């Protein structure tokens, strides 16, 4: 059990608050302009897990061997804590609601695998199959099967220590949706329908809020994100150096993203009362003054809701390299160089609503457009990078000192935003909806209708220009000093030379500063 309490002064003008979690019109708490609040979070997590493993091996002739392994694991977890709570007269903000962890059902995750390994003096092959799943009270079983195959083949070797090996691999790895995606925070939209505050008489106030509570917007069709990767490489060794190079291709499907939806609702807006010493009251679902119902207008608005979706798709390919150039004896310094060339294409196919917040004669714009792009200028990006790290490691065992000097270089960096493979300066929505909530395809005729003109999404042409930065680098250092077998003191400094060059971004027409500011630190490690 744990509790966290915070106190803070709220310096805001008088506000209205309700803790109602259902849609409707409610009499609100009128908050004072300055108050202290206390926010309590009580968590009582629990979990139960079990795991079973089994393995065996079968020696064969000529130093060959086959080994088998299998396993299963299960974990159940939940939380019985009261969660987030506070004094309703002193809320941390006017948009927050209490939320108990008990509202979130227990989560059950499981995984099983089977693996076979074949070994010879020159060949090592691993083949496996893994299945992982997730189950909760409100969701059907979410699961994914992940095959993989790895190979290491010694092509040639010599007694003097020269070897060349081929490595290859193919496999899947999946990522289950998190608890926050399965059970997101419920959405509440509070509109002020009526507010009266008699400045001449303390306590003569009345506030009415209309709450629109679409609730917890869950996506019952949420799937795991799946990464598929293929790689092939060579490993070469000599008595002095080791070189490892890998070519890879990776494809991600059903990546997690969010889709912005807009749900319409209606609310009352009562006439404003400016006369002092009135006694408004709320009864029978209506505001009354001196026995007369206060007139109101019926208005419409939208509540934005973010729904988790599987719409992110990413492709990567590149070359990785690690070279251990050995130790230079006079200096007792070894040099390790690693680098990568990486090209990434990413596209998000989520359908997102955009509501132009325009007011005409104090009336909110009645239409929402739905576009095949996020809030930015496009829906896909392409990037390319070439980088290397040079690590100089100096060891002085006699005094227990290890110094690591790292020179990081970005030789090439390119980035570009696109809209469906091209530019998208002027984009009309694919769909639209009005205050009735019915979604319609957007037609050519509506492009000519002035009523729909605010739905045209415009973007400056330069936002789609490619960005390309000149090389830049950074120098880091780390010094470790051992005091006996149990104590190690480390000093580190990042961006030691304060290299912070600026590079011009064509898409934003601005200069961006690269690298972080220099920072230093000490670490103390004690082993008992």
List each language-model region with its residue ranges:
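Gram-negative outer-membrane beta-barrel transporters
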Residues: 60, 119-125, 249-251, 268-419
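Hydrophobic, lipid-facing positions within transmembrane beta-strands of outer-membrane proteins
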Residues: 46-52, 108-114, 129-133, 145-151, ...
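Transmembrane beta-strands of outer-membrane beta-barrel pores
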Residues: 2-6, 58, 74-80, 120-122, ...
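Extracellular loop and loop/strand-boundary signature of outer-membrane beta-barrel proteins
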Residues: 33-42, 93-103, 132-139, 216-220, ...
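Face-selective signature of the C-terminal outer-membrane beta-barrel domain
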Residues: 1-140, 318
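C-terminal beta-signal and adjacent terminal beta-strands/loops
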Residues: 408-460, 469-472, 478-528
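Transmembrane beta-strands of outer-membrane beta-barrel proteins
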Residues: 50, 66-72, 123-129, 147, ...
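Structural signature of Gram-negative outer-membrane beta-barrels, strongest in the C-terminal barrel
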Residues: 65-67, 73-77, 100-242, 246-251
């Amino acid at each position: 059990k744990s509790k966290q309490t915070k106190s803070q002064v709220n310096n805001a003008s008088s506000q209205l608050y309700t803790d109602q979690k259902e849609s409707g019109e409610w009499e609100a708490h009128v908050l004072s302009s300055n108050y202290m609040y206390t926010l309590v979070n009580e968590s009582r997590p629990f979990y139960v897990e079990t795991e079973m493993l089994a393995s065996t091996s079968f020696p064969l002739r000529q130093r060959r061997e086959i080994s088998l392994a299998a396993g299963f694991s299960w974990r159940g977890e939940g939380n019985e804590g009261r969660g987030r709570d506070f004094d309703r007269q002193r809320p941390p903000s006017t948009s927050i609601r209490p939320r108990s962890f008990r509202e979130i059902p227990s989560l059950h995750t499981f995984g099983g695998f089977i693996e076979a390994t074949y070994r010879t003096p020159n060949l090592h092959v691993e083949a496996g199959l893994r299945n992982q799943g997730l189950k909760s009270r409100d969701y059907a079983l979410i699961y994914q099967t992940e095959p993989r195959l790895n190979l290491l083949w010694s092509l040639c070797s010599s007694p003097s220590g020269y070897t060349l090996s081929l490595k290859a691999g193919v496999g899947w790895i999946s990522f289950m949706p998190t608890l926050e995606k399965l059970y997101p925070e419920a959405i509440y939209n509070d509109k002020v329908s009526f507010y009266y505050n008699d400045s001449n008489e303390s306590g003569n106030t009345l506030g009415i809020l209309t709450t629109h509570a679409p609730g917890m917007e869950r996506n019952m069709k949420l799937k795991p994100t799946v990464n598929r990767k293929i790689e092939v490489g060579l490993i070469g060794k000599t008595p002095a150096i080791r070189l490892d190079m890998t070519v890879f291709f990776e494809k991600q499907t059903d990546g997690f993203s969010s889709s912005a939806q807009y749900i319409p609702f209606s609310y009352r807006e009562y006439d404003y009362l400016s006369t002092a010493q009135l006694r408004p009251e709320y009864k029978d679902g209506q505001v009354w003054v001196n026995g007369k119902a206060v007139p109101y207008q019926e208005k419409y608005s939208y509540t934005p809701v973010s729904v988790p979706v599987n719409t992110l798709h990413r492709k990567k390919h590149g070359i990785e390299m690690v070279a251990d150039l050995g130790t230079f004896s006079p200096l007792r310094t070894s040099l390790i160089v690693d680098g990568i060339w990486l090209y990434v294409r990413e596209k998000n196919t989520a359908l997102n609503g955009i509501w132009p917040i325009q007011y005409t004669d104090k009336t909110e714009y009645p239409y929402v457009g739905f576009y095949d792009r996020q809030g930015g200028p496009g829906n896909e990006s392409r990037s390319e990078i070439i980088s290397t790290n040079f690590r100089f490691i100096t060891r002085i065992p006699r005094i227990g000192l290890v110094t690591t000097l790292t020179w990081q270089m970005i030789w090439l960096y390119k980035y570009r935003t696109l809209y469906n493979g091209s530019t998208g300066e002027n984009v009309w929505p694919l769909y639209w909806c009005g205050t009735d909530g019915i979604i319609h395809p957007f037609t050519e005729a509506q492009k000519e209708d002035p009523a729909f003109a605010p739905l045209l999404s415009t973007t400056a042409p330069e936002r789609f220009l490619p960005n390309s930065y000149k090389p830049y680098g950074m120098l880091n250092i780390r010094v470790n000093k051992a005091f006996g077998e149990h104590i190690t003191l480390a000093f580190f400094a990042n961006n030691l030379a304060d290299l912070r060059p600026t590079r011009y971004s064509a898409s934003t027409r601005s200069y961006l500063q690269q690298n972080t500011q220099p920072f230093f630190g000490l670490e103390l490690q004690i082993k008992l």
